């Protein structure tokens, strides 16, 4: 059975994520407030950002950049 949540990105009710896709408190917040559709859109944008900016996800600085972009893209409040 699918979980329906109010997605703060799409501003409508939609199918929620099947499991938390991000660690920590931010991951819990995303799980409760971001839909699968919005997360898929973010993953596409994330891939473009990583490739165009040649970011290395093993580097903490680059991961921080992606996290900031994710928060902005998904309209997440500061935690």
Curated annotation (Swiss-Prot):
Alphabetically ordered keywords of this record: Iron
Coiled coil: none
One example GO MF annotation: iron ion binding
A GO biological-process term: cellular response to oxidative stress
One CC-aspect GO term: cytosol
InterPro entries recorded: Fe_traffick_prot_YggX, Fe_traffick_prot_YggX_sf
Recorded superkingdom: Bacteria
Role: Could be a mediator in iron transactions between iron acquisition and iron-requiring processes, such as synthesis and/or repair of Fe-S clusters in biosynthetic enzymes.
UniProt subunit comment: Monomer.
Assigned protein family: Belongs to the Fe(2+)-trafficking protein family.
Designated name of the protein: Probable Fe(2+)-trafficking protein
Native organism taxonomy: Bacteria, Pseudomonadati, Pseudomonadota, Gammaproteobacteria, Enterobacterales
């Amino acid at each position: 059975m699918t979980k329906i949540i109010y997605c703060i990105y799409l501003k409508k009710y939609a199918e929620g994520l099947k499991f938390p896709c991000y660690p920590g408190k931010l991951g819990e917040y995303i799980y409760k407030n971001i839909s699968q559709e919005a997360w898929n859109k973010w993953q596409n944008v994330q891939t473009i950002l990583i490739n165009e900016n040649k970011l290395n996800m093993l580097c903490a600085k680059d991961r921080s950049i992606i996290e900031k972009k994710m928060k902005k893209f998904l309209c997440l409040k500061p935690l």
